[in-house]
Amino acid sequence: MPNPNQAIKKENEPIQVENPTELVRDDGEVEGYQKEEGKFKLVLSILKQCIGVKDIASLRFSLPAQLLEPVGNLEYWNYVDRPDYFAVMGDSDDELERMLGVLRWWFTKDLRFVRGRVVKPYNSVLGEFFRCKWVVTDPTVREDHTLDPDSSQLPTYKTEYSETTKFPLGKSYRPKASRTTSSQSVASTMTKSSTKTSKKKSSKKNSKSESNQDSSNDRSSTAPSTAESNNEHLSSSQKSKHSIVFMAEQTSHHPAVSAFYVTCPSKGIEVYGQDQIAVGFTGTSFKVCAGDLNKGVYVRFNKRDNEEYLCTHPSASVGGILRGNLHINLLDSTVILCPKTRIKTIITYIEERWLGKPRSLVEGVCYRYDPSNDTIDSIKAVPKENILATFKGNWRNCIFYSYAGESESRMLVDLNELDLVHKRCPPLDKQFPFESRKIWFPVTHNILAKHYTQATKAKQEIEDQQRQASAAREESHTEWKPRFFVPDEKEGRPTLTEEGKKVLEQSLSDEYIHGS
């Protein structure tokens, strides 16, 4: 087995593809690596076995290492591709603006699909664990409520491929005047949004108590939050810094289910849920959708009276298999709802044409709904008088929104200016034996060196160890229990165990050890 301490890639050094060990940093991260496409005879021979299978994700077969991306499944499926948008989504005092903040995070959380190729990560083994951390400097909020990505001071990385995914006209959508912000401009923008929200609230015949509560919210939302109003006038050393920690554990192997938890305590934000996917193969493309135990992603704002949002997953298809040009298309709809504020959002991913390049179009609506009688499931079915805002655009490029009753189009998020961000993990020699990067390092090292036979052998050894451990538990009638999470099969709300809380506290502390 290679020594992980001898395969170090410093964060700011250029990538040297001809020396693959330098692609691995001392914390085990593979920096910007996505191997060349090809080997389609091998792919097609495997796919022939998948035709007609209802759920490929439940099959027990081992892919050769050369078809895998050198990254663990738990690490790949995190929900924080842009920690800055995660940290600010609950900042606004206006409830509609908070929903728009959740939307901005939702469209940036999977930036890897925009900046990277479609890949297959390692299948997680039972009990596998992944944790990482980001430290975000209070970002500068522009007049249009988008963030200046450079102001977050996040360690980003770029690849030749990721740069080609950026639309040349992306940034030109935003006028130069709106690329900077002041406290007055933010206050003006938030006042306008509060007025629009207030009009929509008054149009509904709510009870007196609801009206009073709404009026109180409107009054408080006319002033910008402290972070927004003071941010521009502070130097980078004076700005607040916020720690974000992501934790995930493989809680079940058959079916494959993992639990995750993300938190930014200083902002009072928690995100949690369970991941499970079902995959089918039609002969020309894969269809991916949420499994039965995957109820969606929960978002909670502790500093907003525990305001909670439930975000459901869309479906997706992976096409271009026969042409050797893999691409992902999002399908169907996503619903984001908040019973406390009575605001619901429907996001619809527009069906692609049979011919031509994918357009990646999306549209949606934010509206008032009745949590006790929630029967609307399409944009067309939303009553016009309940609409608060509408949005549309390209989920790989720019998305725009308009407040109800206004013709002015505003920027929701511009993905062209965003790059992927490094994760801060402990060095390999400080990681738990069952942490993702530690478990899979022998496979990763050999894939980067293009020693695919050795990589496949190392992968099979890991899988054999898991089978032996499973057989031993079965023989001794021992039930395996997750270390860090208590799963929730009914609602998909996992909770941290005492051991999980301890690891979380350690990860949030200033003494948290991470790689260079």
Curated annotation (Swiss-Prot):
Pfam families in alphabetical order: Oxysterol_BP (PF01237)
Gene Ontology molecular function, alphabetical: oxysterol binding; sterol binding; sterol transfer activity
Gene Ontology biological process: intermembrane lipid transfer; lipid metabolic process; sterol transport
Principal location listed in the UniProt entry: endoplasmic reticulum
Gene3D superfamilies from the UniProt entry: 2.40.160.120, 3.30.70.3490
Keyword flag Phosphoprotein: yes
GO cellular component, one term: membrane
Protein name: Oxysterol-binding protein-like protein 1
Source organism (scientific name): Schizosaccharomyces pombe (strain 972 / ATCC 24843)
UniProt lineage: Eukaryota, Fungi, Dikarya, Ascomycota, Taphrinomycotina
